[in-house]
Swiss-Prot record:
Protein name (database record): Small ribosomal subunit protein uS13
Family: Belongs to the universal ribosomal protein uS13 family.
A Pfam match: Ribosomal_S13
Biased composition (Basic residues): 101-124
Organism field: Caldicellulosiruptor saccharolyticus (strain ATCC 43494 / DSM 8903 / Tp8T 6331)
GO BP terms: translation
InterPro entries: Rbsml_uS13_C (IPR027437), Ribosomal_uS13 (IPR001892), Ribosomal_uS13-like_H2TH (IPR010979), Ribosomal_uS13_bac-type (IPR019980), Ribosomal_uS13_CS (IPR018269)
Entry GO MF terms: rRNA binding; structural constituent of ribosome; tRNA binding
Organism classification: Bacteria, Bacillati, Bacillota, Bacillota incertae sedis, Caldicellulosiruptorales
Role, per record: Located at the top of the head of the 30S subunit, it contacts several helices of the 16S rRNA. In the 70S ribosome it contacts the 23S rRNA (bridge B1a) and protein L5 of the 50S subunit (bridge B1b), connecting the 2 subunits; these bridges are implicated in subunit movement. Contacts the tRNAs in the A and P-sites.
Length: 124
């Protein structure tokens, strides 16, 4: 099993698809990596030579932030927005949509499950 950027790539999948299992690499970036390293995108991960795996690994390490490094940068950026108390930072802080979506209805992904509001009744 090929291990690139701390991720075990699935052996049976094509390398083009398998690279997308790495956080920060989508299909278009995967195609770019394979084009620049000269590896056939239709090759299965199990059929890659050690040299090809090393070439891909080195290319990714030199050119992209992926996995933990990318997650840390995203977290730092969000923390910076919160620290400077800008509008986007406050939206992150309150767990509301950041990019201008409506909140009167919908926005359930950011707000979480509904909080049921109960009504107190008089005893009769």
């Amino acid at each position: 099993m090929a291990r690139i950027a701390g991720v075990d790539l699935p052996r049976e999948k094509r390398i083009e698809i398998a690279l997308t299992y790495i956080f920060g690499i989508g299909l278009s970036r995967s195609k770019q990596i394979l084009r620049d390293t000269g590896v056939d995108p239709n090759k299965r991960v199990k059929d890659l030579t050690d040299d090809e795996v090393a070439k891909i690994r080195d290319y990714i390490d030199k050119n992209f932030k992926v996995e933990g490094e990318l997650r840390a940068e995203i977290a730092r950026n969000i923390k910076r927005l919160i620290d400077i108390r800008c509008y986007r930072g406050l939206r992150h802080l309150r767990g509301l949509p950041v990019r201008g979506q409506r909140t009167r209805t919908n926005a359930r992904t950011r707000k979480g499950p509904r909080k049921t509001v109960g009504v107190m009744r008089k005893k009769s």
